[in-house]
């Protein structure tokens, strides 16, 4: 069973995201629970929480089909203590919003060392940040996303993800989300059946499929190994359609949100229908 959808807008309230996902005939969706480019947000009103839960029940979306994403401003590996604390507070708020909405996953980019501390120290800070927030929340899993490795962003190697998981005390509440565009840009080839086999074998050996909690299905405008994060519509970029068909046929990707963040929302419904047809 595959859960397929897109990162839909929550404009007008988080309950509207559910309706937009349903209109795409999606069986999964992602959303921001607050403005992703602001630090602070008003608390979720009780009536909006109720509307969100009612819409999920009405349209058949369980927590395992929904992959909320945190703010882009958060850096859980920030080298400067004051800025690190600000990120940790914001991440806690994001986790608490998920708790309120009855959601069990929160997807986030791990963090950046900003050329001020070494990789290992930054990865340890990220794990420490996760531990602090998991201690203050319950029921929500921290889902680390791999990155393309732009700038000083960590998470572009599977080993980075494994190192963070290793530092998290409650292994039952940490997982990973693999973005195909990011992986490709970071040097993990996905253009053929053979390279898909190799890349996902490596993921299984280094991180473990038991930690896989979601996928972002994106083609890439960026070149292989370029460390540049530029998404494209499925089949229109440098990856091609093989990997997406591969994922839809492989049971290791069952029952997790498979989320489009492709560049043209106007064709999401078509892309979702095409993905479903690959099974």
Swiss-Prot record:
Protein name per Swiss-Prot or TrEMBL: Probable endonuclease 4
This protein's record includes keyword Phosphoprotein: no
Matches recorded under CDD domains: AP2Ec (cd00019)
Enzyme's top EC category: hydrolase
PROSITE patterns reported in the protein's UniProt record: AP_NUCLEASE_F2_1, AP_NUCLEASE_F2_2, AP_NUCLEASE_F2_3, AP_NUCLEASE_F2_4
The record's free-text note on cofactor binding: Binds 3 Zn(2+) ions.
GO MF entries: deoxyribonuclease IV (phage-T4-induced) activity; DNA binding; DNA-(apurinic or apyrimidinic site) endonuclease activity; phosphoric diester hydrolase activity; zinc ion binding
Residues given in the record as Zn(2+) 1 binding sites: 69, 109, 145
EC assignment: 3.1.21.2
């Amino acid at each position: 069973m595959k859960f397929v959808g897109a990162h839909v807008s929550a404009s007008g309230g988080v309950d509207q995201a559910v309706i937009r996902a349903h209109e795409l005939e999606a069986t999964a969706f992602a959303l921001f629970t607050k403005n992703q480019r602001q630090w602070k947000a008003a608390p979720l009103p009780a009536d909006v929480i109720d509307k969100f839960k009612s819409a999920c029940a009405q349209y058949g979306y369980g927590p395992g089909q929904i992959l909320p994403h945190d703010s882009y401003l958060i850096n859980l590996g920030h080298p400067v203590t004051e800025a690190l604390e600000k990120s940790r507070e914001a991440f806690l708020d994001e986790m608490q919003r998920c708790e309120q909405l009855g959601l069990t996953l929160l997807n986030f980019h791990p963090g950046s060392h900003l050329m001020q501390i070494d990789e290992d120290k930054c990865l340890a800070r990220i794990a420490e940040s996760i531990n602090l927030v998991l201690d203050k929340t319950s029921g929500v899993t921290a889902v680390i996303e791999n990155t393309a490795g732009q700038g000083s962003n960590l998470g572009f190697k599977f080993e980075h993800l494994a190192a963070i998981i290793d530092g998290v005390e409650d292994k039952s509440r940490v997982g990973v989300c693999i973005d195909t565009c990011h992986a490709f840009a970071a040097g993990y080839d996905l253009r053929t059946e053979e390279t898909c086999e190799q890349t996902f074998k490596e993921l299984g050996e280094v991180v473990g499929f038991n930690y896989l909690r979601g996928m972002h299905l994106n083609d890439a405008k960026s070149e292989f190994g370029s460390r540049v994060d530029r998404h494209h519509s499925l089949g229109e970029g440098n990856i091609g359609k093989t990997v997406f068909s591969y994922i839809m046929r492989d049971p290791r990707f069952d029952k997790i949100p498979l989320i489009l963040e492709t560049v043209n929302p106007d064709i999401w419904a078509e892309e979702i229908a095409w993905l479903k047809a690959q099974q």
